[in-house]
């Protein structure tokens, strides 16, 4: 054939070695067609913008149909192979951009790094991309590379780039749970130093081969790596090889509601018994979100209906989510109560460390609602064990995005919390807010952390009280009866508008209705001495 004589000198980019067609496409290329991966009729062509020659080109009709459905403003549902993946917009849209860039150019200048909370679908998303593109996947974990024999680990890494990748082009290289390779080495013992040195050598080989054999040669290889580690804990050179960094957040309330609704539709059960207590759907969703459970764990619990295994204190990190705070009810001006909340969202960007004194449960709701709704940041509560060390605490935070909010509820006069807050701020850059029952602080606490006192707020009319009550009861998911609200709103107005009396009434009401007890307050966070 005439086109055989063009190979491999065609100025069009060469003869197509592989063309992947859409499963819904009626398009059949003819000899001499210039093939581009436009994401519609042709999912992928290698090399891009190549000439199709039937005798020389491998044609693959992809069997997987990918369908995208927008669930709401912030979430998508991706359907494929009788499966579905529920993803936040901030995950799915960057992934689409990266994959479409790979389709358009036929290569990427680096890889995709999926990092963040475990059990949220990082591995499943990598497999979805493989099915979407219709190309194979080379999967590598630590056991596939690491060896106890001297030099063999480096050889295994070299074999990936020199043999496996060239023999399987185009392909996806999926490096699952890459913490063993990408996390910065920390030295401390002879054994640890030796292991760190070995991994460091393997990392050097990986970085060099990735640059020389893939990026510079512009090979049709899509590298995807996943990790539960924090971004700041990864090696800088490793991160540079993965310019597409996509963060997986802990599950949102919308995610939990979606899978709960599916369960209700499947079983016909719209109430849930947890630890002997019957919960409505709303109560159940709020409870689940508060535990910080992963989507993978939650789906397993729904399948097995083993709700008694759920515990809000199963981990000392617990995400705090408002039950239902509509934007129309709660807005930025609502929490600016006579100077108590005088800061804005910019104050929560790496500079926060302070103490909130007096009426902790009300303060918690005000500040927590403000941060979540206005600043769009998650909040975490610390539920520590008796012997929790700072090192154990920090290791527990690694799966989350750095610089988020830890909210402590302290016992009276315990300034060790202030010291811990200072250490976390200084050593880890974590924003810290903690609460205590009153404003009687040790001098050390005052020096370490500025504090705010909610008892200084002056309520002069029923409307201000109503706004505050709404904020607090919505935050804790309390379903207040109208007569109870009327009593709270009118409380102490005839007695001279005593702020303390009103706040005491509200706090007592919240403690009773939300079943919060003094024993659940954090008392001993860490032994610092």
Swiss-Prot record:
Subcellular locations according to the entry: Host membrane
Top-level taxon: Viruses
Membrane topology: Single-pass membrane protein
Residue stretches spanning the membrane: 354-373
CDD domains: RecA-like_protease
Keywords carried by this UniProt record: Host membrane, Membrane, Transmembrane, Transmembrane helix
UniProt GO cellular component terms: host cell membrane; membrane
Entry-linked Pfam families: AAA
One Gene Ontology MF term: ATP binding
InterPro entries attached to this UniProt entry: AAA+_ATPase, ATPase_AAA_core, MT-severing_AAA_ATPase, P-loop_NTPase
Name of this protein: Uncharacterized protein ORF529
Native source organism of the sequence: Acidianus two-tailed virus (ATV)
